[in-house]
């Protein structure tokens, strides 16, 4: 009996072991599948998954839905998907950031990771690929930016002498602008102020960059400045040129637009290159720089010489024209757009215009013109400027960014080399921060004592933040203050009653008011402006 049991036991044990192994293996596979499904569901529910977003259509993705007013489309999607979501433009995945928290976490807390630019075709066209604004983030780019920023400040806001020179340029162009506007409004006429405003602002930047100005009827200068809107449409968020490259393969409006874009960039670059070459030829060794172009050339030549004390942080000489192109091109377009907004808001809100004028009359008086030293004593004027920037959000979406590494924003995973759109408009129109954000109300920036609420003013997002923050922000705010203060002090602005009071816009990199007509009249006479300009050194016109 014992022998029999001993003989059968190995077979039984072997059979049992095989069955157990099979069952265990099957159970393990089922458990692994079940666990995998559970983990997948948990992963999808976790905040570190990819950002959500709308369904993308084949070939075009969500491009057809973006439309011209991309910032409004993004704001609508943010209400549905949250402040971080993903769309697809053609085959290009794009993460869109909305709201102060998401944008700050990305651009400020992770500035270097979000500082790159996408490899878009249009970006490579600007300044032959050497653009500071559109160039890739690198050590070379950081050197280029530091040099551009320090030189721009040296010729604008850093020193009392440079601030005085800039005020002089602004005063001279404000005087010329007033004369042109008033003359063209003679006999009660109305005019579109767009062209005179663009020329006035461009002349200030021409004086800073090149040491010269142009007449308001200079055909070559007007032609050069006439393509600002076309440029903005091509490089703005949602532009089809970059995200649907197959459209370049056959005749269509997008390809036509891109070829025009290439030509206008060549024209603009050649304009600046001519100024650069003339400056190099006429630059006197050892002499003080006459303007910003001189300063860049001197810095680059000092670096290239390799002599003791050379400026190793300066620009390379071949980068100088592209950097000046960026500074001159971006500043004159941004400033003219902002100033047009200030004028149209003056005419649409005459009570605001009257309050600005009353504060200027009380603080400055009628026997002199406003100047930068008056700024701290003009809180309502500054409130008007900040509210105009917030309300218009004339730079609604920044130039597209790209990531340099894998990262997370608000828990969502964003891979390296992802294209990122930053919706600044969403910050400026957040009802949680700005009660009734669609109302234009400069008083929202004043505290109970009538002073500027600096914390609120600093939260207006118009010049971006982080590594790509606009280097001309300080200069822009200074010039806008000078222009609008002098204009309001000297003139009255009246809307055309035959036009609709509703404002309409054109969209691109900036939001520009469409053509509008106003009447401009002197509050008194040109005497103050004429006398002030006579004290300035006469500037030699460009040849």
Curated annotation (Swiss-Prot):
One example of a Gene Ontology biological process annotation: positive regulation of vascular endothelial growth factor production
Keyword tRNA-binding belongs to the record: no
Origin species: Mus musculus (Mouse)
Deleted gene: phenotype: Severe ocular drainage structure abnormalities, significant elevated intraocular pressure.
Membrane topology, as annotated: Peripheral membrane protein
Keyword Plastid found: no
Gene that this sequence comes from: Cyp1b1
The protein's name: Cytochrome P450 1B1
Reported tissue expression: Constitutively expressed in retinal and kidney pericytes cells. Expressed in retinal endothelial cells (at protein level). Expressed in cardiac, pulmonary and aortic endothelial cells. Constitutively expressed in trabecular meshwork of the eye (at protein level).
Pathway: Steroid hormone biosynthesis; Cofactor metabolism; retinol metabolism; Lipid metabolism; arachidonate metabolism
Major localisation: endoplasmic reticulum
């Amino acid at each position: 009996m014992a022998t029999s049991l001993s003989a059968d036991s190995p077979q039984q044990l072997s059979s049992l072991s095989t069955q157990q192994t099979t069952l265990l293996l099957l159970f393990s596979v089922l458990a692994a599948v079940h666990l995998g499904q559970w983990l997948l569901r948990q992963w999808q529910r976790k905040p570190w998954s990819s950002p959500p977003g709308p369904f993308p259509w084949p070939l075009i993705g969500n491009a057809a839905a973006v439309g011209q007013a991309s910032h409004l489309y993004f704001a609508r999607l943010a209400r549905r998907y949250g402040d971080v979501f993903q769309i697809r433009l053609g085959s290009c995945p794009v993460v869109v950031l909305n709201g102060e928290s998401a944008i700050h976490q990305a651009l400020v807390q992770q500035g270097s990771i979000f500082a790159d630019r996408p490899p878009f075709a249009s970006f490579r066209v600007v300044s032959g690929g050497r653009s500071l604004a559109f160039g890739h983030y690198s050590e070379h780019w950081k050197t280029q930016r530091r040099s551009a920023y320090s030189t721009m400040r040296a010729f604008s806001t850093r020193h009392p002498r440079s601030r005085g020179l800039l005020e002089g340029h602004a005063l001279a162009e404000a005087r010329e602008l007033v004369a042109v506007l008033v003359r063209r409004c003679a006999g009660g006429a109305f005019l579109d102020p767009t062209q005179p405003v663009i020329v006035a602002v461009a002349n200030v930047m021409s004086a800073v960059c090149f040491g010269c100005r142009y007449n308001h009827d200079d055909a070559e200068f007007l032609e050069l400045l006439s393509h600002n809107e076309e440029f903005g449409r091509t490089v703005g968020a949602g532009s089809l040129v970059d995200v649907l490259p197959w459209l370049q393969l056959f005749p269509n409006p997008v390809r036509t637009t891109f070829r025009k874009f290439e030509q206008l960039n060549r024209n603009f670059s050649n304009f600046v290159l001519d100024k650069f070459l003339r400056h190099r030829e006429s630059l006197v060794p050892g002499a003080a720089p006459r303007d910003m172009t001189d300063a860049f050339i001197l810095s680059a030549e000092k670096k290239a010489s390799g002599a003791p004390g050379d400026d190793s942080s300066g620009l390379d000489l071949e980068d100088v024209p592209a950097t000046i192109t960026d500074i001159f091109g971006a500043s004159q377009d941004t400033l003219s757009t902002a100033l047009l907004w200030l004028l149209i808001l003056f005419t649409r809100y005459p009570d605001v215009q009257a309050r600005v004028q009353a504060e200027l009359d009380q603080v400055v008086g009628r026997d002199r013109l406003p100047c930068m030293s008056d700024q701290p004593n003009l809180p309502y004027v500054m409130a008007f400027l900040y509210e105009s920037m917030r309300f218009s959000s004339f730079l609604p979406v920044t130039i597209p960014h790209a990531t340099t590494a894998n990262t997370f924003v608000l828990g969502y995973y964003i891979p390296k080399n992802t294209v990122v759109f930053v919706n600044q408009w969403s910050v400026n129109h957040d009802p949680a921060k700005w009660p009734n954000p669609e109302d234009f109300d400069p008083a929202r920036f004043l505290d109970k004592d009538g002073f500027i609420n600096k914390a609120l003013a600093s939260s207006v997002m118009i010049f971006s933040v982080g590594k790509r923050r606009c280097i001309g922000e300080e200069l822009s705010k200074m010039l806008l203050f000078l222009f609008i203060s002098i204009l309001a002090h000297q003139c009255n602005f009246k809307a055309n009653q035959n036009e609709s009071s509703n404002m309409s816009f054109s969209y691109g990199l900036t939001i520009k008011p469409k053509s509008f007509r106003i009447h401009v009249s002197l509050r008194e006479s040109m005497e103050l402006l004429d006398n002030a300009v006579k004290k300035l050194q006469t500037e030699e016109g460009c040849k």
